[in-house]
């Protein structure tokens, strides 16, 4: 039998050890423009076609999905890590709220919803 060490529950247990989770980029429609946001806590949910990722209501991604009911998911290739990171660039300070970085990242529109994918990713949902 193995001796177990109890984990203190006063802080998130996931900060105490390494787990593997995919890097994804979530694409949403935001008013008259598009938003891209990298996420790393993403996973299939059960054996059916359900998928989940963690996002706080403080983020535009959450608000966009709540408003439109739609989002696209790109699983970037390992050599696209910098592109994924750039999609988290801050919004313009001119009050427009636009993320100009989205205009220069290699993207394409999805076939079925109004959102963007990252080109050359290995999986699109």
Question: Where do the PLM segments sit?
Answer:
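Active-site-proximal mixed secondary-structure blocks
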Residues: 1-35, 44-50, 54-125
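Short Gly/aromatic-enriched secondary-structure transition segments
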Residues: 39-41
